[in-house]
């Protein structure tokens, strides 16, 4: 039996209850084409195939690829040996994603799967069921004013809705990780919020949350005059001394547009 390799961030999910909740959350039907990232030893692959869906599995570990090819002999199963971050996803034709994500690539992988505010992925996946570190899950679902709320929260919520499916304790894995995990369901928006300049919004978010304890007027001073930021916040009905973490997605969209227009005048 192949052992989990630390350099690949491998932890085998072995809880049948958690596996069942992941499959249920994916709402699979015959005709679905599922991108499975990091199939490992096939614990999720088998129920995915049982559902009647087609499965495109991407695995970096060569030894595991050999085992998976022997294990799954189905016309509905395609295995790609390689790095998911280097793979062009569009030609695969998948409409859903199911993944037990290696925690060391979570950030880049989210960008690869969802795109960005400036360059959203199109066509978008219908839904993504992702097993992630609890800290990341908290950030994806965070509300304004909370400790977990940050630029990642705003970016992801611009692109998709995010809901918790279930908590996953360390004992659900072999070997158990040192952190708690969570399964989340991401459903990309069919219609994205309107924004005058997506790149400008990205720039504001990066700068605003880089020094999150500073008032926005000071955090953004390399981009906009502090007094203009204060006036813009007041115009939007917000406190002139607001910090980045106090603003909702809607606030950021409105602030971005007001400041963009000020910059043009």
Curated annotation (Swiss-Prot):
<keyword id="KW-0963">Cytoplasm</keyword>
<dbReference type="InterPro" id="IPR029063">
    <property type="entry name" value="SAM-dependent_MTases_sf"/>
</dbReference>
<dbReference type="GO" id="GO:0005829">
    <property type="term" value="C:cytosol"/>
</dbReference>
<protein>
    <recommendedName>
        <fullName>Ribosomal RNA small subunit methyltransferase A</fullName>
        <ecNumber>2.1.1.182</ecNumber>
    </recommendedName>
</protein>
<feature type="binding site">
    <location>
        <position position="11"/>
    </location>
    <ligand>
        <name>S-adenosyl-L-methionine</name>
    </ligand>
</feature>
<dbReference type="Pfam" id="PF00398">
    <property type="entry name" value="RrnaAD"/>
</dbReference>
<comment type="similarity">
    <text>Belongs to the class I-like SAM-binding methyltransferase superfamily. rRNA adenine N(6)-methyltransferase family. RsmA subfamily.</text>
</comment>
<comment type="function">
    <text>Specifically dimethylates two adjacent adenosines (A1518 and A1519) in the loop of a conserved hairpin near the 3'-end of 16S rRNA in the 30S particle. May play a critical role in biogenesis of 30S subunits.</text>
</comment>
<dbReference type="InterPro" id="IPR001737">
    <property type="entry name" value="KsgA/Erm"/>
</dbReference>
<keyword id="KW-0949">S-adenosyl-L-methionine</keyword>
<dbReference type="InterPro" id="IPR023165">
    <property type="entry name" value="rRNA_Ade_diMease-like_C"/>
</dbReference>
<keyword id="KW-0694">RNA-binding</keyword>
<feature type="binding site">
    <location>
        <position position="38"/>
    </location>
    <ligand>
        <name>S-adenosyl-L-methionine</name>
    </ligand>
</feature>
<dbReference type="InterPro" id="IPR020596">
    <property type="entry name" value="rRNA_Ade_Mease_Trfase_CS"/>
</dbReference>
<dbReference type="GO" id="GO:0052908">
    <property type="term" value="F:16S rRNA (adenine(1518)-N(6)/adenine(1519)-N(6))-dimethyltransferase activity"/>
</dbReference>
<keyword id="KW-0698">rRNA processing</keyword>
<dbReference type="GO" id="GO:0003723">
    <property type="term" value="F:RNA binding"/>
</dbReference>
<dbReference type="InterPro" id="IPR011530">
    <property type="entry name" value="rRNA_adenine_dimethylase"/>
</dbReference>
<keyword id="KW-0808">Transferase</keyword>
<feature type="binding site">
    <location>
        <position position="59"/>
    </location>
    <ligand>
        <name>S-adenosyl-L-methionine</name>
    </ligand>
</feature>
<dbReference type="InterPro" id="IPR020598">
    <property type="entry name" value="rRNA_Ade_methylase_Trfase_N"/>
</dbReference>
<feature type="binding site">
    <location>
        <position position="100"/>
    </location>
    <ligand>
        <name>S-adenosyl-L-methionine</name>
    </ligand>
</feature>
<feature type="binding site">
    <location>
        <position position="83"/>
    </location>
    <ligand>
        <name>S-adenosyl-L-methionine</name>
    </ligand>
</feature>
<keyword id="KW-0489">Methyltransferase</keyword>
<feature type="binding site">
    <location>
        <position position="13"/>
    </location>
    <ligand>
        <name>S-adenosyl-L-methionine</name>
    </ligand>
</feature>
């Amino acid at each position: 039996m192949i052992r989990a390799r630390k350099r690949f961030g491998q932890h085998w999910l072995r809880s049948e209850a958690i596996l069942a909740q992941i499959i249920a959350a994916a709402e699979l039907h015959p005709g679905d084409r599922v991108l499975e990232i990091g199939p490992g030893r096939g614990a999720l692959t088998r129920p995915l195939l049982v559902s009647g869906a087609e499965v495109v599995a991407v695995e970096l570990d060569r030894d595991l690829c050999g085992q998976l090819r022997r294990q799954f002999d189905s016309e509905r199963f395609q295995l790609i040996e390689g790095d998911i971050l280097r793979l062009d996803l569009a030609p695969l034709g998948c409409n859903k994603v199911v993944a037990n994500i290696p925690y060391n690539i979570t950030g880049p992988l989210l960008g690869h799967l969802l795109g960005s505010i400036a360059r959203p992925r199109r066509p978008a996946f219908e839904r993504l069921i992702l097993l992630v570190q609890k800290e990341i899950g908290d950030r994806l679902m965070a509300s304004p004013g909370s400790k977990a709320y940050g630029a990642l929260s705003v970016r992801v919520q611009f692109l998709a809705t995010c809901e918790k499916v279930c908590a996953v304790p360390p004992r659900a894995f072999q070997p158990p990780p040192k952190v708690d995990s969570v399964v989340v369901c991401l459903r990309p928006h069919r219609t994205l919020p309107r924004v005058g300049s997506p790149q400008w919004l990205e720039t504001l978010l990066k700068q605003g949350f880089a020094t999150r304890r500073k008032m926005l007027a000071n955090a953004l001073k390399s981009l906009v005059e502090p007094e203009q930021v204060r006036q813009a916040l007041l115009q939007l009905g917000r406190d002139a001394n607001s910090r980045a973490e106090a603003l909702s997605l809607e606030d950021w969209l409105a602030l971005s547009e007001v400041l963009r227009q000020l910059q043009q005048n």
